[in-house]
Each structure stands twice: as structure tokens, then as C-alpha cells.
């Protein structure tokens, strides 16, 4: 039997949802472990010891300056080189909501001068269920989501709108298959509010790096791991996004270990 992959959950002051992420990883067969940023700076833990990393949501450092920028700066200072080596090795790095903002600020998904996560079009915090649909063939999540319709997901953010400096950036993202998920209504992808809760260009909800192992998304899969957390399900066999998401991540990390 293959060993449970060790998944590190990166934290600092203001992080939340880490407990939900922890138990989602655990219930999907992984071995989760909290990594406070001070553990990295003190040398108590190293990112290279993990098979996967997750940066959860929250309001790191109170979202001062802008969402994710302080966490990104601190993480880059204490473990930037190690994280880039981790990514270059092909290990999965996931950023959820505030974690997505951190990945963008670190330039781990795309050139941060050409794409950003900015204020919602509504200029307010948006918190509700919506839907997402997989629009890429990302190797981590393809078997769980691709071609299987739309999935309910919770969102909760004020700075989640993906904006690009020019349309050619979006074209490049599509060419490289980096648009992983899009916001949807109960039937298919839509730009309409409130299904697209923030006004993201082309309803983009999730992006990856070119290699496909660094993935950021604004929805919170850890908040819909169980069927009872869904608004409703069409059939008794319907699976929810959270379980599929974490099962896929853990399976991918496990398979990489041989």
C-alpha cells in the first residue's frame, strides 16, 4: 500500500479555514501538517519535507496594503527559493482564496505585472454559494471534474476579481491550458452576477502555472466536503466538489511518490 502523502498547510496571523483544510486532507487519505511561517524562519520545518502544500483562505496580516501581499513577502523572504524548487520538482502547491492571492503576489502563476486579483466589481464582500466548471485538462483534477458538469462551491471574498493588463494575457492563459475552473450557474459557465460573484474576466475562478502543479482558486472546496453542506443535490450518487478536490490532490501527491 502506498504511503499517505504529507501535505503541509501554510499559516500566518490572520489565516483561517486551516482546520477545514486539515480535515479535508486527512479524510481524503493524506497526512496533513500545519506549517506556521515562523516554523520556516526558525528552521523547525522545511517545505522540501512535504509532498504537497496548501495556502488556505483568510485575511493574512489583516489584508493590510492589499490581500495576500504581506504573507507573500514574508513567505518569499523565509522560503522563496525552497518554494520555487518545490514547484520546479513538480510537487502540487494549492492556494485557496487568500492563498490564491498569495500565489499571485509571489508570481508563481503568471507575471504579476500583467494579471492581478483586485476588488470585486460590487465593491463589497461577496459570500454565497455559486457553481464552478472545469475548463482545462489539468492533470491533478481532470479525472475528478473534467466533463462532469458544474459543481456547487462556496465563495467568500472582497478581492477576487481576476483582471489582466491586456487581452493577449488571457489568450496566452488559454493557449497554455491555465484556466482551470470558471464560475457557472446551475447549467453552464456564465458571466452573470451573482454566479460570477466578483466580475472576473471571462468568469475565471481558478488559474494554474504553465506546468499545472501550482493552482489558485477563489472558491472554498474545504467548505463543501460533505453532501449535507450542499444546497441540494440532484441524485443520491452526486458527489460534492470538496471531496473530489481533496481526493484528487491527495491521489496525485501519492502517485508521485510511486
Curated annotation (Swiss-Prot):
Disulfide bonds: none annotated. One of its GO terms (biological process) is 'de novo' IMP biosynthetic process. Residues 7-238 form the Glutamine amidotransferase type-1 domain. Gene3D superfamilies: 3.40.50.880. Its main location: cytoplasm. GO terms for cellular component: cytoplasm. The active site is at 97 (nucleophile), 220, 222. Signal peptide: none annotated. It is found in: Cytoplasm. The keyword Nucleotide-binding applies. It catalyses: N(2)-formyl-N(1)-(5-phospho-beta-D-ribosyl)glycinamide + L-glutamine + ATP + H2O = 2-formamido-N(1)-(5-O-phospho-beta-D-ribosyl)acetamidine + L-glutamate + ADP + phosphate + H(+); L-glutamine + H2O = L-glutamate + NH4(+). CDD domains: GATase1_FGAR_AT. Pathway: Purine metabolism; IMP biosynthesis via de novo pathway; 5-amino-1-(5-phospho-D-ribosyl)imidazole from N(2)-formyl-N(1)-(5-phospho-D-ribosyl)glycinamide: step 1/2. Its EC number is 6.3.5.3, 3.5.1.2. Part of the FGAM synthase complex composed of 1 PurL, 1 PurQ and 2 PurS subunits. HAMAP family: PurQ. Part of the phosphoribosylformylglycinamidine synthase complex involved in the purines biosynthetic pathway. Catalyzes the ATP-dependent conversion of formylglycinamide ribonucleotide (FGAR) and glutamine to yield formylglycinamidine ribonucleotide (FGAM) and glutamate. The FGAM synthase complex is composed of three subunits. PurQ produces an ammonia molecule by converting glutamine to glutamate. PurL transfers the ammonia molecule to FGAR to form FGAM in an ATP-dependent manner. This is Phosphoribosylformylglycinamidine synthase subunit PurQ.
